[in-house]
Amino acid sequence: MTDSIETMIDRLRQLEDQLEAAFAARAGTHGLDLKSGKPRFGPEVRARQRGHKRRIDFFKTPWPTLLTMPLIYGMVIPIALMDLAVSVYQLGCFTAWGIERVRRRDYVVIDRHRLGYLNPVQKLNCVYCGYGNGVIAYAREITARTEQYWCPIKHALKVKGSHERYAAFLDYGDAEGFVKTSEAYRERLKKARAAAEAKASAEAEAEARAE
């Protein structure tokens, strides 16, 4: 049964990769170019996008929306504090434990403000949402690695929205498995850091040779 579960997890990850490729291909139909590492559109596409831009008209904004704006944008303060807190946390703890730190830029992505069909208010909203969701995803991965290091055990009850590491955790009540393999979960994190450092070193050497 264990092999069957691991096979299903691998299949699920393959499907996720296929979905990402499908999303990228569909984005390409809208003229998106990611070859340079940044989202770019050609002149004709940008002109067409600007033609769909809506004017800002606060008088047409529903009053409940206007009343909730202080609550919405006020959340940037606790989100920024969480951003700082988890960054300091992983810098201290992950370094001490010898495991790979989470790359913030992989989770906090701010790019939707470049879209020509968004007006300034919409761009601000997109920056805010991108930052907020990115920080939460960033913090989630940090806490997921912490959970793998200290308590790689599934819950007895179903958990909605569990992180991707959770599926490989030990079953609830598997005392023998915890005693035998809990240290192996830590070693996986340490090996991941060693592999990441080796990859970074190889890339740096390749860039040096190219220069």
Language model: regions and residue ranges:
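Short low-complexity stretches enriched in small and charged residues
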Residues: 41-48, 82-88, 104-109
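N-terminal low-complexity, charged segments
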Residues: 106, 116-119, 128
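Membrane-proximal intrinsically disordered regions of secretory-pathway and membrane-system proteins
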Residues: 1-57, 114, 127, 132-133, ...
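Juxtamembrane inter-helical linkers in multi-pass membrane proteins
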Residues: 95-113
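A transmembrane-helix-recognition feature enriched in membrane-embedded lipid enzymes
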Residues: 62-101
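Short, charged/polar, low-complexity loop and linker segments
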Residues: 57-68, 107-110
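Residue-level signal for mature regions of secreted extracellular proteins and peptides
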Residues: 119-122, 144
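Generic detector of short, well-ordered, non-transmembrane alpha-helical segments enriched
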Residues: 77, 122-125
